């Protein structure tokens, strides 16, 4: 059993100092931008129906963190072009998000990381990139990427001039990998992201890095991005104010 831990902690504090990354590393700046997407009529109808259902759920019982996050993610899924029905099936909705992503890529010079959360989106993104830029232009890094291919894909992205894009999930690629050849990071949707920003912004990066959020207008997307950027706990924030201000 360890003893006197409080005393040890106080002693260590007198000889230690907390230093932030930006204070000790000479890294180029981060730039942030948003690309706005207009919901299709089908999306807007589905979003409004889900919004009404979410309000009914949250007004009808004690609000919990899990309840809030579930409703927010259901709304966000619709802005991404799909949602999970009550029977568990995934329903696809016509949407403009992939079109806007391809517009961003067309305007992007150099290499780009594209983070997405849903497997169907990753597949769709890769198919669209291959169609425009060719099969050697993109690699993946997510849960279904075989372990033996993951490091090879990183090396290809870092060293092969023809490989301009890497598509992955922040759950798999947001920690512990280096992707400093990228000077653009695009968030296709709005899941956990703060650690994933630094896959491109770390030692070895010599260019400024631009972070692009794809945001559906007049939806929960805008609030989610602001909360993530400000490092706000989304569930506690929503519990502390009117939900209608978020959705």
Map each language-model feature to its residues.
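Inter-lobe coupling linker of SF2 helicases/translocases
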Residues: 1-90, 94-110, 211, 228-233, ...
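Short glycine-/polar-rich loops that comprise or flank the Walker A/P-loop
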Residues: 30-32, 134-137, 180-184, 205-212
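Conserved nucleotide-binding/hydrolysis micro-motifs of P-loop NTPases
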Residues: 41-44, 119-121, 146, 172-174, ...
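Helix N-cap/beta->alpha junction signal
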Residues: 94, 117-119
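Conserved helicase ATPase core of P-loop NTP-dependent helicases/translocases
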Residues: 113-115, 123-126, 132-173
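SF2 helicase motor core recognition
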Residues: 122-126, 151, 165-208
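A conserved SF2-helicase RecA2
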Residues: 192-247
């Amino acid at each position: 059993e360890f003893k006197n831990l409080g005393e040890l902690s106080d002693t260590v504090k007198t000889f230690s100092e907390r230093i932030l990354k930006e204070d000790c590393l000479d890294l180029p700046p981060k730039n942030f931008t948003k690309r706005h997407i207009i919901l299709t009529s089908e999306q807007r109808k589905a979003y409004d129906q889900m919004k009404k259902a979410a309000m009914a759920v949250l007004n009808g019982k004690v609000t919990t963190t899990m309840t809030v996050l579930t409703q927010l993610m259901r709304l966000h899924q619709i802005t991404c072009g799909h949602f999970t029905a009550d029977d568990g099936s995934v329903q696809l909705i016509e949407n403009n998000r992939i079109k806007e992503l391809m517009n961003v890529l067309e305007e992007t010079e150099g290499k780009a990381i594209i983070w997405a959360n849903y497997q169907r989106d990753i597949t769709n993104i890769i198919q669209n990139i291959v169609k425009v830029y060719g099969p050697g232009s993109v690699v993946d890094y997510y849960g279904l990427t075989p372990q033996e291919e993951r490091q090879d894909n990183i090396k290809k992205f870092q060293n092969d001039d023809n490989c301009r894009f890497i598509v992955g999930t922040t759950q798999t690629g947001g920690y512990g990998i280096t992707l400093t050849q990228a000077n653009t990071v695009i968030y296709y949707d709005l899941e956990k992201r703060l650690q994933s920003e630094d896959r491109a912004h770390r030692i070895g990066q010599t260019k400024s890095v631009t972070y692009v959020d794809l945001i559906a207008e007049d939806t929960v997307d805008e609030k989610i991005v602001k909360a993530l950027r400000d490092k706000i706990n989304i569930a506690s924030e929503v519990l502390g104010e009117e939900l209608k201000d978020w959705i």
